[in-house]
């Protein structure tokens, strides 16, 4: 045996083994460095510490998990574990493993038209949310994920350049969606996926959480594959009261689910975050606020209007302007005002900060019918807002200044055919229309107006009760419970005459309440008939004889009513045989 050859062979084997171990060590070190770097990137989002290796293992083994509430895409909110987002493809990704959960499991119905709405604007085709699907094994071939350790709420802002949309479509829905889920607390992070920049009022969104909101474009700077360890996607629509006319002309929603109580709680939360307090004013220090616009839809005789208001109501008048004052300063002023006067516009959403008993006065340019544009009237009229509302419209064409030469989105019409321009100029009122580019609507709404003070003051005198903020109290909205122990007795007086006596006990909660007026509603229906006879009664028993027939079966329902309009539930039906 050649000893040198054997030794050389052994040496080569040892060196090869050492090199292999070195390469594995370098790879392992590189992997650790990469994971450390990705951990650092993940923690750039948050102070929350993350076990990167544990998170990656959870994603690889368990995949994505989704559980949703709501039956339709228009009312669905989904909770995800390890929902990912590919910043290059601009797509959300659901990774499947044997442990994945997808409820509801809709199959291809998920695309008809979408899993859910990302904004609170219902069924708008620019606001749909869906995801792509991949097996978890595909992670081996993809960039290493960067994990977002915060609980996140993922949504679209609808129009962050417009105050009405910011409050109605974004802030209120986000606030109450966060109230709905306990882990969407002050430490949660908002993620805006609509693709807009911050916008002029981004500070308002910052008030909802202690964490800086993330924009879609910012996600690209953190990595190619972002994975949200725990996220909620979508918004509650329960707080919205207005639809913008995408399918039918704009107006109040058919089924409004929010009251002034919830609006005022949200307004108080926002004021607290802005460090605004509602200080008690002196009895004689009520004042009127006039919203001043500086670029379009101007009040041309603003000084005269201020003087007329001061003389009519014997109050001082002040002006506020979004262009000239900070938002929190404006809210501080409005929150103690007796009246808010403004041309129609997004700034009127600030009326939600008015004290109870205050008045909202909305002015409309020539040709614009106030009954067709009512977001602020609807807000003021919500039960529990306790605001008075009056609308004034300019009916004098000589008191309007038009701008046909402006760009189309500022009301210009010179780009239209001459015949169409002439029709718009001759029109006395904008016909009902869909959103959002109706040229006649834009032409009229961007006019400047000289307010006819005589008609303006007449409208205020007719429409407003005496302004008295100090006595404005929260109206009770407590509903009665079911009446207790309902009973019926019958008797036959003759072959064609019978009596039906009904009695009951008061609702259980009534003994704990102070109610001005308590009445009872009784419905009587002959079995087999489609119609019934309703009765409103002041007492807890009554004997009916009119239209009561012998040897007949009657169905009887009873309920309690507080203060004429607070209806309780019906008690179980009584079956009464004469």
Swiss-Prot record:
**What's its job?**
O-linked mannose beta-1,4-N-acetylglucosaminyltransferase that transfers UDP-N-acetyl-D-glucosamine to the 4-position of the mannose to generate N-acetyl-D-glucosamine-beta-1,4-O-D-mannosylprotein. Involved in the biosynthesis of the phosphorylated O-mannosyl trisaccharide (N-acetylgalactosamine-beta-3-N-acetylglucosamine-beta-4-(phosphate-6-)mannose), a carbohydrate structure present in alpha-dystroglycan (DAG1), which is required for binding laminin G-like domain-containing extracellular proteins with high affinity.
- Mapped to this chain, the residue ranges on the Lumenal side of the membrane are 26-578
Q: Which reaction does it catalyse?
A: 3-O-(alpha-D-mannosyl)-L-threonyl-[protein] + UDP-N-acetyl-alpha-D-glucosamine = 3-O-(N-acetyl-beta-D-glucosaminyl-(1->4)-alpha-D-mannosyl)-L-threonyl-[protein] + UDP + H(+)
GO terms for biological process?
Answer: brain development; muscle cell development; neuron migration; protein O-linked glycosylation; protein O-linked mannosylation; retina development in camera-type eye
- Segments crossing the lipid bilayer: 5-25
Name of protein: Protein O-linked-mannose beta-1,4-N-acetylglucosaminyltransferase 2
The gene name on file is pomgnt2
Could you list this entry's UniProt keywords, alphabetically sorted.
Endoplasmic reticulum, Glycoprotein, Glycosyltransferase, Membrane, Signal-anchor, Transferase, Transmembrane, Transmembrane helix
- The glycosylation sites annotated in the UniProt record are 98, 275, 541
Q: Could you state a single Gene Ontology molecular function term?
A: acetylglucosaminyltransferase activity
Q: Which organism is it from?
A: Danio rerio
Q: What is its EC number?
A: 2.4.1.312
Pathway assigned to this chain's UniProt record: Protein modification; protein glycosylation
Q: Which CDD domains match?
A: FN3 (cd00063)
Topological domain ranges for the Cytoplasmic compartment: 1-4
- The EC class name is transferase
List the lineage, top down.
Answer: Eukaryota, Metazoa, Chordata, Craniata, Vertebrata
The Swiss-Prot or TrEMBL record describes its family as follows: Belongs to the glycosyltransferase 61 family.
Name the membrane topology term.
Single-pass type II membrane protein
Output the InterPro entries linked to this UniProt entry: FN3_dom, FN3_sf, Glyco_transf_61_cat, Glycosyltransferase_61, Ig-like_fold
């Amino acid at each position: 045996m050649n000893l040198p050859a054997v030794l050389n062979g052994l040496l080569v084997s040892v060196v090869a083994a050492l090199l292999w171990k070195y390469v594995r060590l370098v790879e392992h070190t590189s992997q650790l460095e990469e994971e450390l770097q990705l951990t650092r990137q993940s923690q750039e989002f948050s102070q929350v510490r993350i076990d990167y290796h544990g998170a990656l293992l959870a994603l690889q083994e368990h995949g994505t998990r989704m559980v949703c509430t709501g039956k339709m895409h228009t009312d669905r909110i989904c909770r995800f574990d390890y929902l990912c987002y590919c910043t290059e493809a601009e797509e959300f990704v659901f990774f499947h493993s044997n442990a994945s959960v997808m409820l509801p499991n809709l199959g291809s119905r998920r695309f008809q038209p979408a899993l859910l709405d990302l904004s609170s604007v219902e069924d708008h085709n620019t606001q749909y949310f869906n995801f792509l699907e991949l097996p978890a094994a595909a992670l081996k071939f993809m960039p290493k994920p960067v994990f977002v350790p915060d609980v996140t709420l993922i949504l679209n802002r609808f129009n962050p350049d417009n105050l009405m949309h910011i409050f109605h479509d974004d802030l209120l829905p986000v606030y109450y969606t966060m109230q709905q889920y306990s882990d969407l607390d002050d430490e949660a992070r908002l993620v805006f996926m609509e693709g807009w920049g911050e916008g002029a009022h981004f500070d308002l969104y910052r008030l909802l959480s202690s964490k800086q909101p993330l924009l879609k474009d910012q996600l690209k700077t953190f990595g190619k594959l972002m994975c949200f360890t725990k996220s909620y996607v979508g918004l509650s629509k329960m707080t919205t009261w207005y639809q913008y006319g995408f399918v039918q002309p704009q107006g109040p929603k058919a089924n409004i689910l929010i009251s002034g109580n919830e609006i005022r709680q949200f307004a108080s939360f926002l004021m607290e975050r802005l460090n605004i307090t509602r200080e008690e004013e002196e009895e004689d220090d009520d004042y009127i606020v006039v919203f001043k616009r500086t670029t379009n839809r101007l009040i041309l005789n603003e000084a005269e209007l201020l003087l007329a208001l001061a003389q009519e109501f014997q109050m001082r008048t002040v002006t506020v302007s979004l262009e000239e004052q900070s938002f929190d300063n404006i809210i501080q002023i409005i929150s103690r005002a007796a009246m808010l006067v403004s041309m129609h516009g997004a700034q009127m959403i600030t009326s939600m900060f008015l004290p109870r008993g205050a008045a909202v006065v909305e002015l409309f340019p020539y040709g614009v019918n106030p009954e067709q544009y009512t977001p602020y009237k609807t807000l003021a009229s919500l039960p529990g807002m306790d605001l008075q509302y009056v609308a004034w419209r300019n009916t004098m064409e000589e008191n309007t200044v038009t701008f046909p030469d402006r760009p189309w989105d500022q009301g210009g019409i010179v780009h239209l055919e001459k015949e169409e321009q002439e029709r718009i100029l001759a029109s006395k009122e904008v016909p009902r229309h869909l959103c959002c580019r109706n040229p006649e609507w834009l032409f009229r709404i961007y006019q400047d107006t000289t307010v006819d003070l005589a008609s303006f003051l007449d409208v205020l005198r007719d429409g407003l009760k005496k302004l008295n903020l100090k006595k404005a109290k929260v109206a009770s909205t407590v509903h009665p419970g079911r009446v207790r122990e309902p009973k019926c007795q019958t008797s036959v007086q003759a072959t064609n005459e019978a009596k039906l006596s009904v009695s009951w006990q008061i609702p259980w909660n009534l003994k704990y309440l102070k109610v001005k007026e308590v009445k009872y509603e009784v419905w009587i229906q002959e079995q087999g008939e489609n119609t019934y006879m309703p009765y409103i009664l002041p007492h807890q028993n009554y004997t009916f004889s009119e239209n009561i027939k012998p040897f007949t079966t009657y169905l009887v329902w009873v309920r309690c009513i507080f203060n004429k309009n607070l209806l309780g539930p019906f008690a179980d039906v009584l079956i009464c045989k004469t």
